[in-house]
Amino acid sequence: MSDTDGKKPLGLGGGSRSGQVKQSFSHGRTKSVLVETKRKRVVVPKPGASGSSTTTSSPSHLGDPAKRPAGISDAEMERRLAALRAAKLREVEDAKRRADEERQREEERQRRREELEAKEREERERAEALRQKAEDEERARREAEEATRRAEEAKRAPAPAAPQPAPAESRASAPPSAKPGLPPSRKEREREADRDRTTKKDDSRRSGKLTLNEALSGEGGRTRSLAAMKRKQEKARQKAMGFGHKAEKQVRDVQLPETILVQELANRMAERAADVVKALMKMGMMVTMNQSIDADTAELVIEEFGHRAVRVSDADVEHVIDTVEDKAEDLQPRPPIITIMGHVDHGKTSLLDAIRKTSVVSGEAGGITQHIGAYQVKTESGAVLTFLDTPGHAAFTSMRARGAQVTDIVVLVVAADDAVMPQTVEAIKHAKAAKVPMIVAINKIDKPDADPNKVRTDLLQHEVIVEKMSGDVLDVEVSAKTGLGLDELLENIALQAEILDLRANPSRQAQGAVIEAKLDVGRGPVATVLVQYGTLKRGDIFVVGQQWGKVRALINDKGERVDEAGPSVPVEVLGLNGTPEAGDVLNVVETEAQAREIADYREKAARDKRAAAGAATTLEQLMAKAKADADVAELPVVIKADVQGSAEAIVQALEKVGNDEVRVRVLHYGVGAITETDITLAEASQAAVIGFNVRANASARQAANQKSVEIRYYSVIYDLVDDVKKAASGLLKAEVREHFIGYAQIKEVFRITGVGNVAGCIVTEGVARRSAGVRLLRDNVVIHEGTLKTLKRFKDEVKEVQSGQECGMAFERYEDIRPGDVIEIFEREEVQRKLA
């Protein structure tokens, strides 16, 4: 048997290969690459068919009609030829485009490679320069030290020998590996091989992509990544430049509001939130990143981390309000603002009606002013005056205070037949507090019992000295009914205004004071504003208290629509988003965003203030407050009024109603009609709803009937306060009064089975009744107080026993009675109390 039996002949085709190559990367990663071998199929022509196969591939054969395949027309053949030519043309263009792209990529790679090499070369040169500089400095230092040492040796030895080159120095100057006559050691050979291997790896890294030949041959295996190379170069550069030391910590200015989240504080300091939480825990505060801390604590944390705290306040949003002082050349004369003040029924509104030649007082409920009014009057001389009419009732203290704050001149109206009254004194105090000049108008001079001198004398008690009493306060005797003295009053007002020299800048952004505010059914929130500075125009965006808005319309005191209102002009402003508080200041701002931001801040501040005022700080205070509330009876009410000032006056008046045992609690007060929401609130708290010059709508009336909620309407504040006082008086505990009706003397004590000890008595004074209370006196000391169990005369049970008669008495649950004791007999009466 031959050696080749059963074996296949050897050939160049090779065995079957898997077609996969493993590609190695850095960090021990590998990747399998699938290698595809492109094969071309070679068709071997049959014998005798070589000529035909050769001509078939040529285009001339396709165009030859004699040798064309059957069933193909000339047009179809032309289309095929055109498609074939276009395909060949596309192949040529694609090949050219690929070649261009490959060339561009190669150029880009070459450019990047050159840039990287240039950068590395530059870094090496810089590092070499720094190293050379350091070596030169070190060499200079050594030479200086050597020179110093030689000088010292020269001083010690006058004739030194000629210096010979020290063999140790020559050996030290040579590199450690350069040992003459000795071959390199094994460690040096390994170090040199490692250096060559590293250089080879770096070169292979720059050589570009991994090729198929390298992958098949196993070369170019694990190499360092480009990021690692960049890190290495950056470290070398920083080390050469001397940046290896730790960078100095940056000190930041941290904006610190009133409260701040822990996470936000960490972000502003550029510190880790966990470190901030840890610092707070060291201070004894167990907080998380999402909790807020106060500004003082945050400032301590900022200082601990080495930063600077810059305090900012939420109130900074109000800095957009224009508070610039006006220049003297921009100021122009403005009308004076005169406030009419005085006691109720002294004729303030009647006097103003006489000046305006109108009849406002006839339309006032009860003949008294309950709103603050603003009017403009043009005198016969052409002067324009702005008048504010304030209520005189005691409940309208805040209204009078607001009138005094915005006024230039106060006209104090005093009735000649009534002299100085409590609200007159209050008006004097308001005028003095506002530091405004005063003119005394002695009204009702036409009455028979008028006594102007008594008014002047009474004013002396309050440090108001009129001119006729050698003082500096102007006084005028007037009569609103007959018109006497009105011209003199207007002349004095004009004279006082001329002395004050009132001026304002009409060109700046408007600022004014809210005199009155109300909620109109058809027009929405309406505010009566007295413009103090600038000019208020239609379309202006403004903020007033906790509300903001855009001026939709301006209405003057005559009910006419105007486009603008200058200084000292009272107007009604429409376009608010809510009803402001009377006394708030109106400021015009640039944008709606600013107005909304300021209003939101003010609302939040007011809410926090209310919460802080009503909150108990300690458990003891909370318990004491709860106990005090439990001992006080409350009368809950809901107040709705036509204007904001009236609502405030009612609330202030009701807060004064009550004592230590009962008080009035205003659950809610507002302006506008009574709504179903008010009824729901009243039902939940078992309160009454009070409407002052307003009415309930249909749904509110229906809800009140269903839920049995009482609604009361008033138009005069006197009646309202009196009725609430009566209702609050009903919550007071009745006062128990005792009336002594008789005395009885115990003569003998009997023991009766089933009854106990029975006292045999004689009524010495008054009468003894079965239903009355009794006290047992022994030696004029009360030893028992109770009621009678039985009252008998002889053997009959009786209701009462008259004086001088004998009877038998037994006490309820008490038997310690002795002969000689005295029984005091009395009756209790409950008397209903009333609030003062």
From Swiss-Prot:
Region named G4: 443-446
Chain positions covered by the region annotation G2: 367-371
Main location: cytoplasm
Residues engaged in binding GTP: 342-349, 389-393, 443-446
Pfam families in UniProt: EF-G_D2, GTP_EFTU, IF-2, IF2_assoc, IF2_N
GO MF: GTP binding; GTPase activity; translation initiation factor activity
Entry GO CC: cytosol
Localization per Swiss-Prot or TrEMBL: Cytoplasm
UniProt biased composition (Polar residues): 18-27
Keyword terms, alphabetized: Cytoplasm, GTP-binding, Initiation factor, Nucleotide-binding, Protein biosynthesis
Presence of keyword Kinase: no
Keyword Protein biosynthesis among record annotations: yes
Region (Disordered): 1-234
Ranges where the tr-type G domain occurs: 333-501
Region (G1): 342-349
Compositionally biased residues, Low complexity: 50-60, 167-176
Sequence ranges of Basic and acidic residues compositional bias: 88-156, 185-206
Region (G3): 389-392
Domain of life of the organism encoding this protein: Bacteria
InterPro entries with a match to the protein in the record: EF-G-like_DII (IPR053905), IF2_assoc_dom_bac (IPR013575), IF2_II (IPR044145), IF2_N (IPR006847), P-loop_NTPase (IPR027417), Small_GTP-bd (IPR005225), T_Tr_GTP-bd_dom (IPR000795), TF_IF2_bacterial-like (IPR000178)
Chain residue ranges for the region called G5: 479-481
Record NCBIfam families: IF-2 (TIGR00487), small_GTP (TIGR00231)
Chain's role: One of the essential components for the initiation of protein synthesis. Protects formylmethionyl-tRNA from spontaneous hydrolysis and promotes its binding to the 30S ribosomal subunits. Also involved in the hydrolysis of GTP during the formation of the 70S ribosomal complex.
UniProt similarity note: Belongs to the TRAFAC class translation factor GTPase superfamily. Classic translation factor GTPase family. IF-2 subfamily.
Name of the protein: Translation initiation factor IF-2
Gene source species: Cereibacter sphaeroides (strain ATCC 17029 / ATH 2.4.9) (Rhodobacter sphaeroides)
